[in-house]
Swiss-Prot record:
Tagged with keyword DNA-binding: no
Record GO biological process: translation
Domain of life: Eukaryota
InterPro entries noted in UniProt: PSRP-3/Ycf65_sf, Ribosomal_PSRP3/Ycf65
UniProt keywords, alphabetically: Chloroplast, Plastid, Ribonucleoprotein, Ribosomal protein
GO cellular component assignments: chloroplast; ribonucleoprotein complex; ribosome
Disulphide bridges: none
Protein name: Small ribosomal subunit protein cS23
Gene (name only): ycf65
Function statement: Probably a ribosomal protein or a ribosome-associated protein.
């Protein structure tokens, strides 16, 4: 069972990602939202995860890979797919909002 998930704001001009820890049937925020392309969200997520030594390297890598996949999808496909299709592509993420 995963210990972490990504929370996503899917917007027209930005995508924002935050990391939440899964606790029981709920989640607890670990980070604030980091925006792409306004800022380098990937680097910010990386720095935030590295500042938490109790998160295993394997989990950090997995979260960063998921962040990369999400950002790439937003850049390449946001105009091609509906929001529902995007949500179905990332079923383990929590979509907190969209335009």
């Amino acid at each position: 069972m995963p210990k972490f998930t990504l929370k996503v704001l899917w917007l027209d001009n930005n995508v924002a990602v935050a990391v939440d820890q899964i606790i029981g049937n709920g989640t607890s925020p670990l980070t604030c939202y980091f925006f792409w392309p306004r800022n380098d969200a990937w680097e910010q997520v990386k720095a935030e995860l590295e500042s938490k030594p109790w998160i295993e390297e394997k989990e950090r890598i997995e979260l960063l890979n998921k962040t990369t996949e999400l950002i790439n999808c937003w850049q390449e496909q946001s105009k091609k797919y509906s929001f529902k299709e995007i949500q179905s592509k990332f079923p383990d993420f929590i979509f907190a909002g969209a335009n």
